[in-house]
A protein has these predicted regions:
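Short linear capping/connector segments at secondary-structure termini
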Residues: 27-31, 84-87, 152-160
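Sec-dependent N-terminal signal peptides
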Residues: 4-13
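Proline-centered turn/helix-capping motifs that create local helix->coil transitions or kinks
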Residues: 20-21, 57-61, 69, 140-149
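TPR/Sel1-like alpha-solenoid repeat signature
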Residues: 130, 203-209
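Short, surface-exposed recognition loops and adjoining beta-strand edges that mediate ligand/DNA contacts
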Residues: 60-71, 150, 188-204, 215-258
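Conserved, well-structured interaction surfaces
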Residues: 39-43, 47, 51-55, 75-144, ...
């Protein structure tokens, strides 16, 4: 009898060590482990990534591009060109906050391989993720040059980012180029319909990035400037050939803005 009692107690004690029930996920609420299974799951998640894109406004690009003139708003990025920007002594988190966005993109990218999608569908959503991640890394590249390269979801230990190694400008630019070239080849040509990221959007960003990086390297005496400038020429020519006119009638655009 004593042996049976010891056996029963041993079994009960062993069952207490099984804490698998603590790892169960809510049946009615999506989680990172359950929300990325189908094509529509990724489509729904990707909608939230569009918020990083700038809103459209008349003349807004004049204040964020390479144009510099006296009437430009005082807070615009053109102040870099006019040499009116001063570097603050204290820490500025503005650009580093882009990493919280990059983490959201990486969260989607990390779940693609384990989904139920076909290989073609996986390549499409990987392309969408690469577009958005490249878009934000281009901002970091233009502001800092070399920065930490993060292509996966980090652990809760913040030192992996804050105290992690700083990748070189060559490495960051190379990753952006590689990701956008992959996206150009694999994204759905027409995206998910109107006002969604498609092949032309990827090509436009690729052209813009390569022109920026190629000219920066050329005029700062860095290597591989021709690599980026040739790629800019190639993809720009294809865009122009595909879309020779942005609008059928330019007057219609003027009437719209007026």
């Amino acid at each position: 009898m004593r042996k049976y009692l010891i056996f029963i107690c041993t079994v009960l004690l062993a069952s207490c060590l099984n804490n698998d029930f603590l790892e169960r996920y809510p049946l009615g609420d999506p989680t990172a482990e359950t929300a990325f299974e189908t094509y529509d799951n990724f489509k729904a998640y990707a909608w939230g990534l569009y918020e990083t894109l700038p809103s459209l406004g008349y003349g807004s690009e004049n204040s964020t591009d390479d144009i510099s003139y006296n009437q430009t708003r005082g807070t615009s990025e053109s102040n870099w060109i006019r040499k009116l920007v001063t570097i603050p002594d204290k820490k500025d988190n503005t650009s580093w906050n882009y990493y919280s966005y990059i983490r959201r993109v990486n969260l989607m990218l990390d779940r693609i391989d384990g989904s139920k999608m076909t290989d073609v569908e996986k390549a499409n959503w990987r392309s969408v993720g690469y577009f958005f991640r490249s878009y934000r890394y281009l901002s970091l590249l233009s502001a800092y040059g070399g920065v930490p390269w993060i292509d996966h979801v980090l652990s809760d230990d913040e030192t992996e980012l804050i105290k992690g190694p700083r990748a070189s400008r060559d490495e960051i630019a190379g990753h952006i180029l590689e990701d956008l070239q992959f996206a150009e080849k694999n994204i759905n040509v027409n995206g998910e319909g109107r006002n969604t990221i498609n092949k032309a959007c990827v090509q436009a960003l690729l052209s813009r990035f390569c022109l920026f990086e190629g000219t920066w390297r050329k005029y700062h005496g860095l290597n591989n400037a021709e690599t980026y400038l040739r790629e800019c020429k190639r993809v720009s020519a294809e865009l122009i050939q595909t879309y020779p006119n942005v609008a059928d009638c330019y007057d219609d655009l003027s009437v719209h803005w007026n």
